[in-house]
Amino acid sequence: AAAVAIETLKIYDEIDLIGHVKSVGPHLQAELQRRFANHPMVGEVRGVGMVGAIELVEDKAAKKNFDPARKIGPRLVKHGEEQGVILRAMMNDSIGFSPPLVITKDEVTEMLDRVERSLDALSVELRRESIAAV
């Protein structure tokens, strides 16, 4: 097991994985902020390095969470699957991002394009439900 770990560390060094993460991580964080901080359904964008999350809220100004019975996070995950992106729903309708450490900046852009399309589809779905409930 130790030999495998040592070989893995050698590969990380050969491909400069740490340098790559130091380059791509800030790009991921900046893109998360740029794309989602002002979205009406996003109450908070948070993260560090190659890990991030967006918190989905019903009312951005009041930071009011959705009713848990509506399962908004899992519904966004489903839309993500339809867009070809894997999302992780967490407590309080937060969606987590933890892409592979070898992801490129272009792939981050593509991933977040798909997340945006998923969030847009969920927004349309929720508006339809609101109209139907009236």
Identify the role of each PLM range.
Residues 1-134:
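Conserved N-terminal phosphate-binding loop of PLP-dependent enzymes in the Aspartate aminotransferase
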